[in-house]
Amino acid sequence: MSKRTYQPNNRRRARVHGFRTRMRTRAGRAIVSARRRKGRKSLTA
C-alpha cells in the first residue's frame, strides 16, 4: 500500500507557494497580479 501524496508542512507550503517566493520571478508577480485583478480573497498560500 502506497502512502498518501499530500503530507502537509507549513514551512514547505510557504517556501514553495508563498508571497515572497511569488514576487521573486516575473511569472510569479503575474500570478499575484492576476489573482488581485480577479479579486481573490487569498493571493498566496
From Swiss-Prot:
It comes from the Bacteria. Keywords: Ribonucleoprotein, Ribosomal protein. Gene3D superfamilies: 1.10.287.3980. GO terms for biological process: translation. The keyword Magnesium does not apply. It holds the Pfam family Ribosomal_L34. Signal peptide: none annotated. GO terms for molecular function: structural constituent of ribosome. The keyword Metal-binding does not apply. GO terms for cellular component: ribonucleoprotein complex; ribosome. Belongs to the bacterial ribosomal protein bL34 family. HAMAP family: Ribosomal_bL34. NCBIfam families: rpmH_bact. This is Large ribosomal subunit protein bL34. It comes from Corynebacterium urealyticum (strain ATCC 43042 / DSM 7109).
